From Swiss-Prot:
GO biological process: carbon fixation
GO molecular function: magnesium ion binding; ribulose-bisphosphate carboxylase activity
Database matches in CDD domains: RuBisCO_large_II
Function in brief: Unknown. Probably does not have RuBisCO activity.
Native source organism of the sequence: Symbiodinium sp. (Dinoflagellate)
Coiled coil regions in record: none
Family: Belongs to the RuBisCO large chain family. Type IV subfamily.
Disulphide bridges, residue numbers: none
Name this polypeptide is given: Uncharacterized ribulose bisphosphate carboxylase-like protein
Note, other: Only found in Symbiodinium A, a minor symbiont of the giant clam Tridacna gigas.
Pfam entry (one): RuBisCO_large_N
Length: 537
């Protein structure tokens, strides 16, 4: 059914639509199937996105979506959707993002005359945005006592996906936190190997002990992937009840649009860690249908989550491209500078970008330089636990390379390349040097000549470590002996007065403060007795 006269108007002025504020503008890459006219297919696409090509009438015309721009050669199509199309809540009158998704990203992308269609940007007018909610909790740096902005790297999320039992998980969390990392994540939730009723109390013990020892806030991201709102509510309340005074440091880890909105409403005071569940199936550069990663992230901003995975511009394992930088910048700025038009956020609070995907210390400096800052949450499970000297050294190395990047940027090493600056920094920082030996393939690609510069030509590279119970800490015997002799007995006694529920880790423990220089960041986490106590308690 030819509907271009009703659902297309190529004379429509985009600037005028922006001024009147009555349309949501959506930009697509769309290709008709062979033999179909581009404009006719675009009009059919618009019709099925709104009032319907076969059931419309003149009375519905004010609600018609209109194709206002096409370029058949570049396969670009833009549609203006009247804001009156979108559903709103009965309870408070707010517009529904779900309604926008249904119309703009619905089944139109797979119609009989459409080869593919993919959204690469959209614009929401102020009238639509003002009917959305801003997060009750802003960026996570306040939680970690790092200031409201420019908080720097919050590194080291550990997220075992299956099979780690409660006590090893507690010990691993403790080791990572003691290494200067701020975050652990529990995506196991209530799986058979680690029931929530057993696992969460163990993490609480680790956080309590670590915060007491370092006087530095830590964060735990509790898995709250559920099918039902009641289950989400029950899990969230249970976790918060267990953490008690540390409940403000708990994050609700959710996946999917509905879950993000539900978590925000149910737990308005908690930081919402929003995971783009299955995002690669739609937002990967290899996918011709769905929407780009930029669009997915923009939607998360609209539903007012407080953080979202922003990928790593191909510095990690996940496919990415230059728009990934735009994603991270958009989450932290008051406006999104995009391909379609500038999106003002109307005072919505900032989001915190999360980067993940097999990142390690060696890959971070170039990522920071490309992004222009280091204000991200890093999940570096393999980068921390894969380090040859264990998770603490892996976490310390991630913090150290941030310092190395800042030192290079400030001109401390003169007119040298970033890679040479990091190598120079590594000469006096054993954890980074250990990362070079642990990840030699990355080292060879990013830091040519590193072996000669670091004097490692005679040293064999070592395989990444695997996390096993016996390797929570790989502190040398000499370091352990030093820790034993320097430990203040009175402090140890005071730490142990509350019993194992407060401080289950005994033995040679030397704490550090993340604000200290990386020269003081090297630490002995657990003596041999401490490791055994951590595993057997």
């Amino acid at each position: 059914l030819e509907q271009s006269s009703r659902y297309a108007d190529l004379t429509l002025d985009e600037a005028g639509s922006l001024r009147n504020g009555e349309h949501v503008l959506v930009a697509y890459i769309m290709k008709p199937k062979m033999g179909y006219d581009y404009l006719a297919t675009a009009a059919h696409f618009a019709a099925e996105s709104c009032t319907g090509a076969r059931s419309t009438d003149d009375a519905k015309e004010s609600a018609n979506a209109v194709v206002y721009y096409i370029d058949a050669d570049s396969q670009e199509m833009r549609i203006a959707y009247p804001t009156v199309l979108f559903d709103s809540n009965l309870t408070d009158g707010r517009d529904m993002v779900r309604s926008f998704l249904t119309l703009a990203i619905g089944n139109t992308q797979g119609m009989e005359d459409v080869e593919f269609g993919k959204i690469y940007d959209f614009y929401l007018p102020p009238s639509f945005l003002r009917l959305q909610e801003s997060p009750s909790v802003n960026t996570m740096w306040r939680i970690l006592d790092k200031g409201a902005s420019n908080g720097g790297l919050a590194a080291g999320a550990m997220k075992p996906k299956l099979g780690m039992q409660p006590k090893p998980f507690r010990a691993a969390s403790y080791a990572l936190w003691q290494g200067g990392a701020y975050t652990t994540a529990d995506v196991q939730a209530n799986q058979a190997p680690t029931q929530a009723s057993e696992g969460i109390p163990e993490v609480v013990k680790a956080m309590r002990s670590c915060v007491q020892g370092t006087d530095v806030a830590k964060r735990h991201s509790g898995g709250n992937y559920t099918d039902e709102p009641k289950e989400m509510d029950a899990r969230g309340k249970y976790v918060l009840s267990q953490f008690g005074p540390f409940s403000g440091n708990c994050v609700s880890l959710v996946a999917g649009y509905a879950a993000g909105g539900s978590a925000r409403h149910t737990f308005p005071r908690q930081f919402v860690h929003y995971h783009r569940a299955g995002q690669a199936s739609t937002s990967s550069p290899q996918t011709q249908r769905g929407y780009s990663a930029f669009v997915h992230t923009k939607i998360s901003q609209v539903i007012s989550t407080t953080s979202i995975h922003a990928d790593t511009m191909s510095f990690g394992k996940t496919q990415g491209d230059s728009p990934d930088k735009s994603i991270a910048v958009m989450l932290q700025d008051d406006a999104a500078d995009a391909r379609l038009c500038n999106q003002e956020w109307e005072g919505m609070r900032q989001n915190a970008p999360i980067i993940s995907g097999s990142m390690n210390a060696l890959r971070l400096p170039a990522f920071f330089e490309t992004l222009g800052n280091s204000n991200v949450i890093l999940t570096a499970d393999s980068g921390s636990f894969g380090h040859k000297d264990g998770p603490a050294s892996g976490a310390i190395a991630c913090r150290q390379v941030e310092e190395a990047w800042k030192a290079w940027r400030s001109g401390q090493y003169g007119n040298v390349s970033l890679s040479d600056g990091v190598v120079e920094f590594a000469k006096t920082h054993e954890e980074i040097k250990g990362a070079f030996l642990t990840f030699p393939k990355d080292a060879d690609e990013i830091y040519p000549g590193w072996k000669e510069k670091l004097g490692c030509t005679a040293e064999a590279s070592v395989p990444p470590a695997s996390f096993v119970n016996a390797k929570i800490s790989t502190a040398s015997s000499a370091a352990v002996a030093t820790a034993r002799t320097t430990m203040n007995a009175a402090k140890m006694a005071s730490q142990s007065t509350a019993g194992s529920a407060v401080n289950p880790y005994t033995g040679g423990l030397k704490s550090i403060h993340p604000a200290s220089s990386s020269n003081t960041a090297r630490t002995v986490l657990l003596s041999r007795q401490g490791r055994e106590a951590a595993l057997q308690d």
